[in-house]
């Protein structure tokens, strides 16, 4: 059980690190005259898209979470109006 949790954690961590490193160039070699074969091309990186295209897939999710429900008399707004009055007495 714990072994499978460790394996899934390592897999998820490695996938997230690979995604981050996929969009950034690898450090170039410091040997002069030697070509750098390990430079990752950034033209295929999704993070280089324009701002409107980059977050287009998140737009429906953000719209749902930012939608606020209105209730009458402040019920459900998160503010407990009577608890402060009780504590004051």
From Swiss-Prot:
Propeptide: 24-69
Role noted for this protein: May play an important anorexigenic role. Modulates arousal and anxiety as well as increases locomotor activity. Binds to its receptor NPSR1 with nanomolar affinity to increase intracellular calcium concentrations.
Protein name in the entry: Neuropeptide S
Leader peptide range in chain numbering: 1-23
GO BP annotation list: neuropeptide signaling pathway; positive regulation of action potential; positive regulation of circadian sleep/wake cycle, wakefulness; positive regulation of synaptic transmission, GABAergic; positive regulation of synaptic transmission, glutamatergic; synaptic transmission, glutamatergic; visual learning
Matches recorded under Pfam families: Neuropeptide_S (PF14993)
Keyword Signal recorded: yes
Database matches in PANTHER family: NEUROPEPTIDE S
Keyword tags: Cleavage on pair of basic residues, Neuropeptide, Secreted, Signal
Name of the gene: Nps
GO cellular component, one term: synapse
Domain of life: Eukaryota
Phylogenetic placement of the source organism: Eukaryota, Metazoa, Chordata, Craniata, Vertebrata
Subcellular location as annotated: Secreted
Principal place of residence: secreted
